[in-house]
Amino acid sequence: MSEKQQSSSIIEEFGFPAEVIQLLDRTGVTGEVTQVRVRVLEGRDKGRILTRNIKGPVRLGDIVILRETEREARKLTTKR
């Protein structure tokens, strides 16, 4: 197995690294979840920009590991 194939199988086993490029909003009952835009750094969707919800502290430039890159978070709506 070549080194490139081995590294891609490791990435798919643990998740896909993505960089936080924009903080959008906070959600959840107490604001514990942050909606962010991330750019996928490796894997089959490399370069794709996704909207995801992240629980816990997060800053611009952070690297997060996504288990999958198929789903996107829904846009937040405000109650009237």
Swiss-Prot record:
Keywords of the record: Ribonucleoprotein, Ribosomal protein
Protein's GO biological process: maturation of SSU-rRNA; ribosomal small subunit assembly; translation
Recorded GO MF terms: structural constituent of ribosome
CDD domains in alphabetical order: S1_S28E (cd04457)
Database matches in SUPFAM superfamilies: Nucleic acid-binding proteins
GO CC annotations, alphabetized: cytosolic small ribosomal subunit
Family matches, as Pfam families: Ribosomal_S28e
Domain of life from the UniProt record: Archaea
Annotated family: Belongs to the eukaryotic ribosomal protein eS28 family.
The name this protein goes by in its record: Small ribosomal subunit protein eS28
Organism from which the protein derives: Metallosphaera sedula (strain ATCC 51363 / DSM 5348 / JCM 9185 / NBRC 15509 / TH2)
Species classification: Archaea, Thermoproteota, Thermoprotei, Sulfolobales, Sulfolobaceae
Gene (UniProt): rps28e
